[in-house]
């Protein structure tokens, strides 16, 4: 996924009201931009970090600029625009870069399904195998305190919506379709992923139950730069002991 036109650079002053951020430009001016991320963004929104943003030519938008990437003071690259995760996974599937998801004939997005009025991120179909329902989650929370190098967690805040998605995926698996939770690792420092039991215990428990019901968990990491982001490798998923 190439950024075109090229992203522009600034310095983060603050993020506020969840969806807004003030950014200082190199000429000293300050602009307010949209932040497409509902999470806590722990470690992704520290004042003083370098941010890279896109600009829309849509005159109807209240905020023309969108925060896309953070370049931390530790040197990590993070994609904070969660809307990019789904598009990135779709691109990787169509290019055959996710080997577990090859062999399907049709791909749809945002399809209604389930008993809780949900929409699946990606639906794959084939005449020769069951439908494949894929829920994509963006992973950007890096544990830099415990000394376990490269450990990433999801979620970074309590997510009732994410809990609902796990229940829906489990029901799909029980009905005989293929059901997948795909963690898109969008932080250059993360090398492995675990459920954040210390943040959302209910989500962790539901994830374990979903796997027991037949839901598959995949974790793929993206390569990130100011020019492009793309899926490059599979990383490990494992449960962790509760943090004290």
UniProtKB/Swiss-Prot annotation:
CDD domains according to UniProt: SfsA-like_bacterial
Family, similarity comment: Belongs to the SfsA family.
Taxonomic source organism: Vibrio cholerae serotype O1 (strain ATCC 39541 / Classical Ogawa 395 / O395)
HAMAP family, per database record: SfsA (MF_00095)
Name listed for the protein in its UniProt record: Sugar fermentation stimulation protein homolog
GO MF entries: DNA binding
Pfam family of the protein (one): SfsA
InterPro entries linked to this entry: SfsA, SfsA_C, SfsA_N
